[in-house]
Regions:
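Conserved ATP-binding TGD loop and adjacent catalytic N/P-domain core of P-type ATPases
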Residues: 1, 281, 288, 362, ...
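Flexible metal-binding regulatory segments at protein termini and peripheral loops
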Residues: 1-146, 156, 243, 269-272, ...
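Conserved cytosolic catalytic loops of P-type ATPases
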Residues: 28-46, 50, 220-222, 251-346, ...
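Soluble-to-membrane junctions at the N-terminal ends of transmembrane alpha-helices
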Residues: 91-114, 166-189, 353-386, 402, ...
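Transmembrane helix-loop-helix hairpins at the membrane interface
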Residues: 102-260, 372, 473, 744
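ATP-driven catalytic headpiece of P-type ATPases
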Residues: 107, 329, 453-502, 532-611, ...
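Membrane-embedded alpha-helical bundles of multi-pass transporters
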Residues: 128-143, 172, 176, 191, ...
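Juxtamembrane coupling segments of multi-pass membrane pumps/enzymes
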Residues: 200, 204, 209-211, 226-288, ...
Length: 779
């Protein structure tokens, strides 16, 4: 399978989006289509053996729109995500496109208003009692009034010709859009007005001067057509401006990337180059205050790096030789050199931007209902408008009243409000998530997370740091009560025995010794005893390190209950012996993260059941669980990596929606099995297989924040869908005159156009409220 992105031109409303989707979905070999109305783009998964990008573009063209490939022939991974696409940071962002559209629309709007003001004044002045020049009030000059209105209308029609071109084109293709509603409504007003002018001409020719003036006053709708076009443009302009703000998070990420960087040659000379020209393996220098241009590994120097743009973590991270640095993070203090490892589309920044854009290109399940409604909305509105015209003619016999209501129905209807409700909120929600270091890979993941009833936490690397550390150093006591050796001597003994071991516990002990400046001595006759520990000889001394079983086999007495006490605290004790006597104990534990207990409390406050899954024995697992506020019933212990997926499935079979949180190292099957998989603390490796959501930081609180953001986003979408349906449900009958017997009031097409424009603006504005989202469970 391949996945391509296409730029799609000519889409103006939700109906357009639905038509493009249908046209491409019908092609053989197309697996899925996701059309993004906001970005004017389309993401297509297809079989290259059955259909080509040219075939897809042709299908879009036949539907009445234009399409061109942005990326082609990209192979997709098993999870469907694109690999090796062009660097997102170097693509034109949707925000830039929308700003360009808004700029052109502003020019159209200014011209429209310049001509609309005199047109409206002249056309409505006689009804509102406004003073008018005698040339427009004298009965003998009634044709002058009509011709002046027509001349003022022509520039408005000219600058807004896109409504007519796109609208009638959609009618020809049998797929009417919102532009068709505007085009037919405005055309009907203009056509009736032109017909009235011919009647006026006949009346003037027959000397019926007064009748001609009355015909003009009652039947000229040029100002209505001009007002409809201008108000729709006002609404479109405001809508486009608002939509351009929804992509602010992506735009901010793109702007973080520096344009130039400093390359350090082998002879030490430094040269400023464009970031696009950097190759993996090159050495670069970064000075205080500069943004890091690409991903890499520090070679010399040290500094504090601000990674908040990528992870949301406000505290700068200390970096020294051997540490990784990422593009778009900011060097705060010292100067350092680093070797480039990932450039262009492979950097963390580019991958984050691509993830956010891919999420925006997908559809949330909640959008399907709106898409179905939008697909049939316009034809239904045309039918209602026709019925309205016929009904008014039958009841009143007045073409004016029938035309007024029929046109009002056309222009008040707004499929855009329905179509915008979901994609705008998804774009703002995923963008806000990116700002917080929470990356949703799809709109479906964003929606599904709100329904999660159980969160399963993988212990190692999720609840705990995933890196064992020394917690206790206990020196043994001789029979006379004196210490067997000093604490430093015990650590020297431990270092000598553990320096050759690759066991994680040995690494923890060596790290502690390094911190204290203790250098490991050389030993002889080193031997590993499987499942027990190690033995060796240091000079004339026989030394050993291991568990209780090894000590027992060596005839060394260990104080009763000591091993059990450490195990109950979630610690692993290592016993050290010298010449047949116990020298001391060093306890090692995988430390619990500072925020894990707070995160468990936060998840409970959201009504979520929390479970911990681990391969540790139950005693150790329950000790960790107690420290974070979990009961023994909420612990699933002694689980092999291959069995984690089975335990998640069992929870699902019990009727729970499950979110699995892990580091993506040995729990990928469980992440994939869960209703929502969250990979935590992945840093630069953001494309974890199986994960639906990537949490950039190692903070478990982000799980609670992600659930809150999901709920806030879907709540926002439901609000918009409700008001869009409510607006159309009330507005269309009102325009048709259903309430006329009660109110005695007939809705003007001009008010209908204003209401239609405001409805879309309101939907977008409501979605923009998500930009100020703050989780209630924040620290």
């Amino acid at each position: 399978m391949a996945q391509d992105t296409f730029d799609v031109g000519g889409m103006t409303c939700a109906a357009c989006q639905a038509h493009v989707d249908r046209a491409v979905s019908k092609l053989d070999g197309v697996q899925s289509v996701a059309v993004n109305l906001l970005a004017g783009s389309m993401l297509v998964d297809y079989d290259p053996a059955q259909v080509s990008p040219d075939d897809i573009c042709t299908a879009v063209d036949r539907a009445g729109y234009s399409a061109s490939p942005v990326s082609t022939g990209t192979e997709t991974a098993p999870n469907g995500s694109a690999q090796a696409r062009s660097g997102a940071a170097h693509m034109e962002s949707p925000t830039k496109k929308l700003e360009a559209v808004a700029s052109a629309m502003r020019t159209r709007l200014i011209i429209s208003i310049i001509f609309l003001i005199p047109l409206f004044y002249i056309g409505m002045g006689h009804m509102l009692g406004w003073p008018l020049p005698s040339v427009f009030t004298d009965h003998t000059h009634s044709m002058t009034l009509a011709l002046t209105e027509l001349v003022l209308l022509i520039p408005i029609v000219y600058v807004n010709d896109a409504y007519f071109i796109n609208g009638f084109k959609s009618l020809v293709h049998g797929a009417p859009t919102m532009d068709a509603l505007i085009a037919v409504g405005a055309t009907a007003s203009i056509a009736w007005s032109l017909y009235a002018m011919f009647i006026m001409a006949d009346q003037l020719a027959a000397g019926q001067i007064h009748e001609a003036m009355m015909t003009g006053m009652d039947n000229l709708y040029f100002e209505s057509a001009g007002t409809i076009l201008s108000l729709v443009t006002v609404g479109k302009y405001l809508e486009t401006r608002s939509k351009s703000k929804t992509g602010g998070a992506i735009e901010a990420l793109i702007d973080l990337a520096p344009k130039t960087a400093t390359i350090v040659a082998d002879d030490g000379t430094e040269t400023a180059v464009e970031v696009d020209s950097i190759l993996p393996g090159q050495v670069l220098r970064v000075r205080p205050g500069e943004s890091i241009p690409v991903d890499g590994v520090v070679l010399e120097g040290s500094s504090a790096v601000d990674e908040s743009a990528l992870t949301g973590e406000s505290i700068p991270v200390e970096k020294t030789a051997g540490d990784t640095v990422n593009a778009a993070t900011v060097n705060r203090t010292g100067s350092f050199t680093f070797r480039a490892t990932r450039v262009g589309a492979d950097t963390s920044l580019a991958k984050i931007i691509q993830l956010v854009e891919d999420a925006n290109a997908t559809k949330a399940p909640i959008a399907r209902m709106a898409d179905k409604v939008a697909g049939v909305f316009v034809p239904v509105v045309f039918a209602i408008s026709a019925v309205t015209f016929v009904a008014w003619m039958a009841l009143t016999g007045s073409v004016n009243e029938a035309l007024t209501s029929a046109v009002a129905v056309l222009v008040i209807s707004c499929p855009c409000a329905l179509g915008l409700a979901t994609p705008v909120a998804i774009m703002v929600g995923t963008g806000k998530g990116a700002e917080m270091g929470i990356l949703f890979k799809s709109a479906e993941a964003l929606e599904n997370l709100r329904n999660v009833g159980t969160v399963v936490l993988d212990k190692t690397g999720t609840v705990t740091r995933g890196k064992p550390a020394v917690t206790d150093i206990v020196v043994a006591t001789r029979t006379d009560g004196s210490p067997a050796m000093s604490e430093k001597a015990l650590l020297k003994l431990a270092a000598a025995l553990e320096r050759q071991s690759e066991h994680p516990l040995a690494e923890a002990i060596m790290a502690e010794c390094e911190t204290r400046g203790i250098v490991a001595r050389m030993v002889e006759d080193f031997a590993a005893v499987p499942g027990r520990g190690v033995t060796a000889r240091e000079g004339q001394n026989v030394i050993a390190a291991g568990n209780v079983r090894l000590m027992s086999e060596l005839g060394i007495t260990v104080p009763a209950g000591l091993a059990e006490r450490f195990a109950a605290e979630g610690k692993t004790p290592l016993f050290f012996a010298k010449n047949g006597e116990l020298a001391g104990i060093v306890a090692v534990a995988d430390e619990v993260k500072e925020t894990s207990a707070e995160a468990v409390t936060a998840l409970r406050s959201l009504g979520v059941d929390v479970r911990m899954l681990t391969g540790d024995n139950r005693v150790t697992a329950e000790a960790i669980a107690r420290r974070v506020g979990l009961t023994s019933e909420q612990v699933i212990a002694d689980v092999l990596p291959a069995d984690k997926e089975r335990h998640v499935r069992e929870l699902q079979d019990a009727g729970s929606k499950v979110a699995m949180v892990g580091d993506g190292i040995n729990d990928s099957p469980a992440l994939a099995r869960a209703d929502v998989g969250l990979a935590i603390g992945t840093g630069a490796d953001i494309a974890k297989e199986g994960a639906d959501v990537v949490l950039m930081r190692s903070d478990l609180m982000d799980v609670a924040h992600a659930i809150e953001l999901s709920r806030a986003t879907i709540r926002n979408i439901k609000q918009d869908l409700f008001w869009a349906l409510f607006y159309n449900g009330i507005g269309i009958p009102l325009a048709a005159g259903v309430f006329f017997p009660l109110t005695g009031w007939q809705l003007s097409p001009m008010f209908g156009a204003a209401a239609m424009s405001l409805s879309s603006v309101c939907v977008v504005s409501n979605a923009l409220r998500l930009k100020s989202f703050k989780p209630k469970t924040a620290h």
